[in-house]
Amino acid sequence: MKYVGAHVSASGGLANAAIRAAEIEATAFALFTKNQRQWRAAPLSDETIAEFKAACEKYHFGPGQILPHDSYLINLGHPVEEALEKSRDAFIDEMTRCQQLGLTLLNFHPGSHLQQIPEEECLARIAESINIALAKTEGVTAVIENTAGQGSNLGFKFEHLAAIIDGVEDKSRVGVCIDTCHAFAAGYDLRSAEACEKTFAAFERIVGFQYLRGMHLNDAKSAFGSRVDRHHSLGEGNIGHDCFSWIMQDSRFDGIPLILETINPDIWAEEIAWLRAQQIAEVA
């Protein structure tokens, strides 16, 4: 079964994220459990936790259908020790919040070397950051998102994801989320069913579908291989419709959150309905 939704706002209370997801007839959703542009947040109250769990139960969202995202400030591969520790502490807090909310996944951008340390050292720092967080939490899987490769961000090659996973001690609690816009911008072609087959064959060979815990379904304003992260509405960008039809018809993408981060929230309900319809359509 395909779980399809969008990254919805938790404004006014975390429970509202589940309500907003239900309003667009989603069967999955993503959210921030705190302000994504601040380091600190007040601890979750018992009331907030209870309200969130009740809303998820009411609208039939299980933990495997929800893909929380951490703060954009966190850099688990930071070259400077003091800044690295700050990021690690913040990541542990994000994992703990997920644990308190009964969630089992936490999606994050791997990190950046800031042109100060070699790629290999940065990847090793990211893996060690994950190890530290997993040791201090329970039941939550760290889900590494591939990146477009802007600036000094790592994670734009499948090999980066594989290297991080290789350094994580508890393989049962690490996974990946593939963002289609990021992959396309990083040089993985998705413009046809044939291109998708080739790209995901490479993913299977290098990373493995057993680690796929979620997807971000985004078209791309940015050009192929541009290393620029610019999302677009489905079918309106440089990837086109075929990729998303192909994903909806492939059982390897069953049972994980498929999350829209497309640029027009007003048409998320339409995009979700279109994606569902592709399950019985044929790629042209």
From Swiss-Prot:
Positions annotated to bind Zn(2+) 1: H69, H109, E145
Q: Per its record, what are the GO molecular function terms?
A: deoxyribonuclease IV (phage-T4-induced) activity; DNA binding; DNA-(apurinic or apyrimidinic site) endonuclease activity; phosphoric diester hydrolase activity; zinc ion binding
Reaction(s) catalysed by this chain, per the record, are: Endonucleolytic cleavage to 5'-phosphooligonucleotide end-products
CDD domains assigned to the protein according to its UniProt record, in alphabetical order: AP2Ec
Cofactor(s) recorded for this entry are:
Zn(2+)
- Positions binding Zn(2+) 3 in this chain are H182, D229, H231
> Which Enzyme Commission numbers does its entry carry?
3.1.21.2
Q: Name the residues that bind Zn(2+) 2.
A: E145, D179, H216, E261
Q: Which InterPro entries match?
A: AP_endonuc_2 (IPR001719), AP_endonuc_F2_Zn_BS (IPR018246), Xyl_isomerase-like_sf (IPR036237), Xyl_isomerase-like_TIM-brl (IPR013022)
| Cofactor annotation remark | Binds 3 Zn(2+) ions.
Q: Which Pfam families match?
A: AP_endonuc_2 (PF01261)
Q: Which HAMAP family match?
A: Nfo (MF_00152)
Of which family is this protein a member? Answer: Belongs to the AP endonuclease 2 family.
**Cited function:** Endonuclease IV plays a role in DNA repair. It cleaves phosphodiester bonds at apurinic or apyrimidinic (AP) sites, generating a 3'-hydroxyl group and a 5'-terminal sugar phosphate.
What's the protein name? Probable endonuclease 4
Q: Which gene encodes it?
A: nfo
